[in-house]
């Protein structure tokens, strides 16, 4: 993952979609303005009540036919490998019945690493994985979607699992 992932999707697609981003980005001068112009949905990640209200708003957007782009890693760092996927996107897919289309974005971390602002040459690519759809509205189904997405991304990216560090 990289700062470039969203820009790559914007520049390489004619589809109309909205990003889902952490609420803190709305307060950032450049990123907030850019994301608001793209019609982003900002979500609360800390306060459960705010997060629940945001989830309902996202379900309404999905029911209205809006395409949402969610980066399920939630964040990124300089370390290689795929981070654990957060459950939000998969719970939304299970609750709404919306189709999930995993996208594997490669090369952006090498091109612009976390904490660096000078790009390095790298091949960029976006791989579309097979679409997934929930078969029922349940937590176990959301877990199945998460695990299937993770397996598809790891296969396309040819990256290792990233083992989280504790302490």
Residue ranges of each PLM-predicted region?
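Non-catalytic C-terminal accessory region of glycerolipid acyltransferases
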Residues: 52-167
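Catalytic core of membrane glycerolipid acyltransferases/transacylases, capturing the structured
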Residues: 1-48
């Amino acid at each position: 993952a990289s700062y470039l992932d969203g820009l790559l999707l914007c520049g390489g697609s004619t589809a109309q979609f909205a990003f889902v981003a952490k609420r803190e980005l709305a307060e950032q001068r450049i990123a907030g303005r850019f994301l608001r112009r793209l019609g982003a949905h900002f979500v609360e990640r800390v306060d459960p009540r705010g997060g629940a209200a945001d989830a309902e708003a996202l379900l309404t957007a999905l029911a209205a036919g809006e395409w949402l782009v969610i980066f399920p890693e939630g964040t990124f760092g300089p370390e290689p490998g795929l981070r654990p996927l957060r459950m939000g996107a998969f719970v939304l897919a299970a609750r709404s019945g919306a189709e999930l289309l995993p996208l594997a974005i490669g090369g952006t971390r090498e091109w612009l690493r976390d904490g660096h602002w000078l790009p390095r040459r790298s091949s960029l690519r976006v791989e579309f994985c097979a679409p997934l759809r929930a078969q029922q509205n349940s937590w176990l189904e959301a877990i199945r979607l998460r695990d299937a997405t993770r397996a598809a991304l790891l296969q396309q990216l040819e990256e290792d699992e990233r083992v989280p560090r504790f302490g």
